[in-house]
Amino acid sequence: MFRGIHQVSVDAKGRMSLPARLRDDLAQYDDDGVVVTIDPVSRCLLLYPLSEWELIQQKLDKLPTFQPQARRLQRLLVGHATDLEVDKAGRILLPAPLREFARLDKKLTILGQGKKLEIWSQEEWEAQREDYLSQDALEDLQTETMMDISL
């Protein structure tokens, strides 16, 4: 289970180092690798342990291909999905097309989101977080379904 926020860097070759805590969390999955794809809603990447991704892909494969919204989602998620390995130093080489989509430069923010990680440009994440914390966004959170959550 992934949680927490982590600041990391990308080297000149496009490799991102996973913090030790996240490597430990990933090791619990006993998978040979990870899958990284784009987020169809935000300018970030989604990193899944291989076994978690396979469950998602099974659901995506069952969507009706003649439904435009389903096809769009399949193209975005599966079309950009890339199998990657974590090297012995705990680094992942992020492909250039994925880095370009998420506007990743040298400084990244990794957010634990349960069964997946979100990989953001630090600048993009800070702007998004400020937007989430704005008064209008906070008022949007006050829906009936959110009232059942106690923090």
UniProtKB/Swiss-Prot annotation:
Location(s) in or outside the cell: Cytoplasm, Nucleoid
Annotated ranges, domain SpoVT-AbrB: 5-52, 81-124
Any GO BP: negative regulation of DNA-templated transcription initiation
Family: Belongs to the MraZ family.
Keywords, ordered alphabetically: Cytoplasm, DNA-binding, Repeat, Transcription, Transcription regulation
Domain of life: Bacteria
GO CC, any one term: cytoplasm
Keyword Transport: no
Organism: Marinomonas sp. (strain MWYL1)
Protein name: Transcriptional regulator MraZ
